[in-house]
């Protein structure tokens, strides 16, 4: 009994297949996406000059013409790491065309020399296979990057996109960073 697709589609799949029978379960997660204009633009998952616990960071950029308040937004991955952006001040603002660095540590003498706009806790970047998922205050996905081995980063080298308006979900959109900063990492 087929309740998932129309009989016409089931018949077409049946007729097209040389490996009968064909059974398939398809489901879609209840995910809401939001076009807020904030893009993940650079990721330092594996710092070389300091430990991961001090030197991990990622960068976002506001591609809109409006200032956006990040208060109440969240970062997470699929392994359960999650952090809600919060400030004792009323807002966490990112101006139009502004780049904004989120990191585990803002002490430049400990984090490899990167200038940080916001410090997070409870969230880590794997050195080989992970996700950076950015959600707005309502829980809608604003942007996400799923990276793995083969993406253009290595120990001490972040990966970046050169154009924040291209699809940053594609490996071909990312490049190894070539600018040295702080203690010698590239980012």
Which residues fall in each region the model found?
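Activation on beta-sandwich/Ig-like modules and their edge loops
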Residues: 29-171, 183-184
């Amino acid at each position: 009994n087929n309740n998932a697709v129309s009989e016409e589609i089931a018949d077409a799949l049946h007729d097209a297949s040389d490996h009968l029978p064909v059974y398939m379960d398809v489901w879609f997660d209840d995910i809401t996406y939001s076009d807020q204009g904030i893009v993940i633009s650079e990721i330092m998952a594996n710092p070389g000059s300091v430990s991961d616990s001090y030197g991990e960071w990622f960068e976002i950029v506001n591609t809109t013409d409006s200032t956006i308040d990040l208060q109440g937004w969240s970062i997470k991955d699929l392994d359960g790491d999650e952090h809600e952006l919060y400030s004792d001040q009323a807002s966490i603002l990112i101006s139009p065309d502004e780049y904004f660095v989120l990191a585990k540590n803002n002490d430049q003498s400990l984090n490899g020399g990167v200038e940080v706009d916001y410090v997070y806790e409870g969230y880590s970047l794997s050195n080989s296979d992970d996700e950076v998922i950015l959600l707005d205050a309502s829980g809608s996905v604003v942007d996400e990057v799923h990276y793995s081995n083969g993406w253009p980063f290595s120990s001490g080298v972040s990966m970046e996109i050169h154009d924040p308006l291209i699809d940053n979900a594609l490996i071909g959109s990312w490049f190894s960073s070539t600018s040295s900063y702080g203690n010698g990492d590239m980012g």
